[in-house]
Structures are given as structure tokens and as C-alpha cells.
Amino acid sequence: MSAQTLAISNLKPNTTRHLASFHPNIWGDRFLSCAAESTDIEDDMEQQVERLKEEVKKMIASADEPSQILNLIDLLQRLGVSYHFEKEIEEALQQVLNMNSDSDKDDDLHSVALRFRLLREQGLNVSCDVFNKFRDRNGHFIQTLKTDLQGMLSLYEAAHFRVHGEGILDDALAFTTTYLESIVPNLSPPLAAQISRTLRQPLRKSLARVEARHFISIYQEDTSHNEVLLTFAKLDFNLLQKLHQKELKYISLWWKDLDFVNKLPFTRDRVVEGYFWILGVYFEPQYHRARKFVTKVINVVSVIDDIYDAYGTLEELVVFTDAINRWDIDCIDQLPEYMKVCYKALLNVYEEIERALSEQGRSYRLHYAKEAMKKLVQAYLVEANWMNKNYVPTMDEYMSIALVSCAYPLLTVTSFVGMGDIATKEVFDWASNDPKIVRVASIICRLMDDIVSHEFEQKRGHIASSVECYMKQNGVSEEATRDEFNKQIVDAWKDINEEHLQPNYVPMPFRTRVVNSARIMDYLYKDDDEYTHVGELMKGSVAALLIDPA
């Protein structure tokens, strides 16, 4: 797009800036006027949830056959209530692991695949050799398996937990995908829609709350549904939704008070989308303070990103980067007026959480979060230099910076800050030293983002993305580049699965945050950048999670 000039005080006159023209916030003040529920009603809902929760615990305890245990756990996960029973599920899956699973009734494709998936998801490294029994002498999957739709769907879901060198799971994914795609046109509309959704978003890459909201509506139409589980899931979803609505109202008021929409009109106004993003990282009630902090950080980072990408001159960005590195309010006088607004907001967000952490004796965590922010803006400045020189780096050079500028290392460290006693200094040391699982999640983030957004960014004037870098370095077409990147994304997911199975690793809650970050990218960037260009997928997802009750 054409360069535009925007006059702001303290700037050199007639400074030419390449503006991105992001579309405005589509939600208006909707979430500012979230109606407060009667505390009596919420108290009653909480009491019902606690009563039903005890009934579900009895169900888990009374399940003794492996298939019964596995199907119940699968159901609890899909309904979005498994977070209530983490200890019980861990013990039950350990029990299943120790059981003899060779009985005929647990030997069908569905049971074997479900057992494999749930155990791998729990971080237990079970062998993929369990699927050998479903192959013929030539190593191909037996064609009669296609008569078992439930088994084929379960095998498809299990195959997404593959790691490098597991050719049988590569074959399983190809086998099930080809078959499921072939039958969709001949199925009834509801079943066709359900399988199409599964093909687009397998459980390994789905967002927990989005999946729960969808599955609750499917499960209630099942005539064999368990009334206790359905009632529990709906009550729990609606109670959590009320909490999330209150959080978003609080965040929206904070955002409105900052008035970035008027003070920094060249930036993206995506406070609702930012909150949805963080809901994908963690939705559980115990992380309510963490969600508020990280949502504020992510929204300020979005503004900072736009300052580096779409507005600031190189001279201004050098000063801005130095100010963030110094992290001192006295630096504010060196900044142009528009940067002062953002800089003050950034320091205030961290100061607010630092006060809360100091009361708990955890203020050391902010050091890690601040260092991650400093690394991020340093990467932004390198990219701004490239842009200023019209420089196209090599892929290795580009990725060394882009895996930081994608902000996933920052998101990882920052998401741990409010996670309670389990977030030890050792966890922060680990997260701050480029662990492989964070690095490969960042690869997924960067490549998926670049694939869908590079055309828009090149039109407005932007650094060369990985797409342009790879095409230039290898002399190949855009289509060939996309194919190569998609292969790298597949490999990155295998790396994530592999890291998830490592013994003596960081605790599961931290691994889950990283996996969830990769899931968000797969969900929102599969066809377009749904954060920058809010489309039907984002609109529908926000409505399902934050507006419409179950």
C-alpha cells in the first residue's frame, strides 16, 4: 500500500511511514457491558458442580476394565472437565499401563488406539508396535479395518502422537486420512460435518475449550449419553464462562483506559482476540490471575510489534529498544510522544504483577519475564534494520531472529509467572535457555504465520518473510516453499511429541502450556491470520466460548 504521513507531536515533520491499515475492533464495547450474575445463582451452580464432581469421581473409581477406564477418560477430556480429575486420571492410566491388555475385548482397533493415545498424552512412552497386529504380511493396514469407523477415527487421532522413526504411525495417518476423506461425501450431513471437523482439527491440535463446547452439543444429542456427565459438563462450562467473561470485562476496561485506539491508531485493536489466545494457553480457574497478566502483556506486545513493523523509524526504534533494555521510567523523556504511551503501559503492567508477586515472595520471576521482553525487542530491531536496508537474509539467519520475534519464547516464560508454587526457579531457568520443545513450537508459529500472512505484509512494506528468504536462497516457487514448510511443521510436531515423552522432564503443566501454544497457531493460522484479519473462525470461536452458554 502507499506510504502515509501521520503527524504526532515530538516527531520530525513530514516523516514518511508505511502504515498497515488494520481493520478496527469488531466487538465494540460488547464485553464492557458483561452482565454480572447474581452471586446466589453462581453459588448454587458451584454447589451443583461440586456435588456432581463427587459422583464422577465414584465413576472413575468404579471403572475396573481397561476399555471402561479409557472410554470414560476420553469422554471427560472431550467434555472439557478432565482438569477436575488430574490425579485420578493419572492413577487410572498408570493402572491401565500395568494391566495385561491382551484380552479379546480390549484388542479391537478402537481400544488399542485409544489406549495408545491417552498414555502418550500422559507422557508415557508406549510402543507403536501395538499396531502391528492390524497389518498384513506386506506391512499394509488390513483393508477390513475400514468397516470399523470408530476404530479408524481412533487410529487417526492416535497417529498424531507419532515421533520420528515411527513409520507405522506415518502409514496409519495416511491410511485413515485417505479413507475418512473418501467417505465424507456419502455420509449424512451431521456425521460428514463431524468427520470433516476431525480431519481439519485432530484432538492433538485442538483447543480444549473449543473442543469441549462443540462436543457438549454433540453429546447431548446422543441418546445413550450419561445424564450426570452431561449436566456436570454444561454447568462447569457455563460457570467457567462467567469467570472468563468477568476477566475479559476487566481486561477490556484496562484497554479502554489506555486509549490506544485513539493515541496509537496505527496499531491492531485486538484485546478480545488476545484474551481468546490466552484462553487457549490455559482456561482453568486457578490461573485467573495469570491470564489477566499474560493477556495484558500480549496486547502490549502486539502494539510494540506494530510500532516496529508498521510505524516507527529506525532512529526512533533504536532509542525505543534502548529504553526497554534499560527498563527505567526516566528513559521516557528520550522517546517521541507516541512511544511514551506504549512504554509507560509496558512498565505499568510489569510493575502491577511485581507488586502481587512480592507479597508472595516470588518477585524473582519478573526478572525472567523482563529479560524475555528485552530479547524480543532486540530481535524486532534486527528485523527493522533488515527492512531499512531491503536486506533478504539467508534462512538460517532469518530463523535465528524470527524464532525470537515470533514472541513464543516470551509467551512461554510469561505464562509461567502466575502459575503458583509449582513454577520454581528451575522451571524458569529451563524456559529461558531455549529448550527444544519451545524452539519447535516457535518454528510452528513462525512458519504458519509466514505462510498465510506474507502476501499482505509484502504489499504494505515489510521485511522478507521465511517464504521470500527460502525462495531466494533455493530458487524455488512459492508452492514448493509452502510444501517444504508444511513438512517442517510436521517434523516440529513430531519433535513436540518426542519432547513430551522425555523422562525427568519439567512438570506436565509447563509442557502443556507449550503444546497449547502450538495448538493455537494450528487453529488460528491454518488458512489465514485470524488474529490480524478477524474472520468467521475467530468470530464463531469467541461467540462459542465467551458469549453463548452451553
Swiss-Prot record:
Cited function: Probable sesquiterpene synthase.
One GO biological process term: hydrocarbon biosynthetic process
Note from the entry: Does not produce any detectable product when tested in vitro.
Keyword Phosphoprotein in record: no
Comment on protein domains: The Asp-Asp-Xaa-Xaa-Asp/Glu (DDXXD/E) motif is important for the catalytic activity, presumably through binding to Mg(2+).
Gene3D superfamilies to which the protein is assigned, alphabetical: Farnesyl Diphosphate Synthase (1.10.600.10), Terpene synthase, N-terminal domain (1.50.10.130)
Alphabetical UniProt keywords: Lyase, Magnesium, Metal-binding
Superkingdom: Eukaryota
Motif (DDXXD motif): 305-309
Protein name: Probable terpene synthase 2
Cofactor(s) this protein requires: Mg(2+)
An annotated Gene Ontology molecular function: magnesium ion binding
Binding site for Mg(2+) 3: 457
InterPro entries named in the record: Isoprenoid_synthase_dom_sf, Terpene_cyclase-like_1_C, Terpene_cyclase_plant_C1, Terpene_synth_N, Terpene_synth_N_sf, Terpene_synthase-like, Terpene_synthase_metal-bd, Terpenoid_cyclase/PrenylTrfase
